[in-house]
């Protein structure tokens, strides 16, 4: 399975005109919420989520090591911007490039920093099903709200293997389980069968075939929650009425943009929401236009999360960061040092 998040952000991203909409959401404001299914497990899940970057130190003796102090700063920023929750150590969070011990540290630090102000989903997928189950139990012990996983990666490329993989992980804890669908075409008659498994109650859908998704949803035998995972397609997904929110990479950089998309879609004000979706598309377009943009862009808002780990990323130079800064300046809607101003 190809889990390259960039492939799923890039398709459909287009440069659009500047709309001049700087987003500063106030989490204390009474806002409209996208609907969620009935049931306690779905309470408080509606809205925009960041697939959180896993922060590392940049430079010095700790270069590339997990930066837990930055995790606390990220959490505070996301709370202030009105995000609903965080999705940890998935594709954006470089889960497969972290050790199990590092992933557990991320879960624990996020939960203790959030203090119940953000919902937390831990992606626990590993190459080995057994390792995934062990990590799921560690995540549950850390206090996360849900666990999640991609289908088998590299090995186990069959529906039967994926079913067994999900069965084992979802039964490893009593927490609700969120399928992470990315990289393969959704086959309604097959995919719906995942929802017959214990504790499987939702999906992060990083795809664009809303027809097949709808066909699958009509076959569900129990309530389930869905999140749009392709940043540049969030509003398209919300317009189908199938999604309760979004989980994405660039929600880290411009969280208020996605908060506004969800709020306005909940009010059925899609014309206003489209202006914020244009911000998303322009930011995603910059991500693919400038070398080293991914993750290093967080320096612009004052939250340096370090370089992506090899082989996913090669450390950037000061000159390359200057190009990233120039590209974000040109967008006109991202406030420099927003997290510390």
Model-identified regions with their sequence ranges:
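N-terminal secretory signal peptides and thylakoid transit peptides that target proteins
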Residues: 1-16
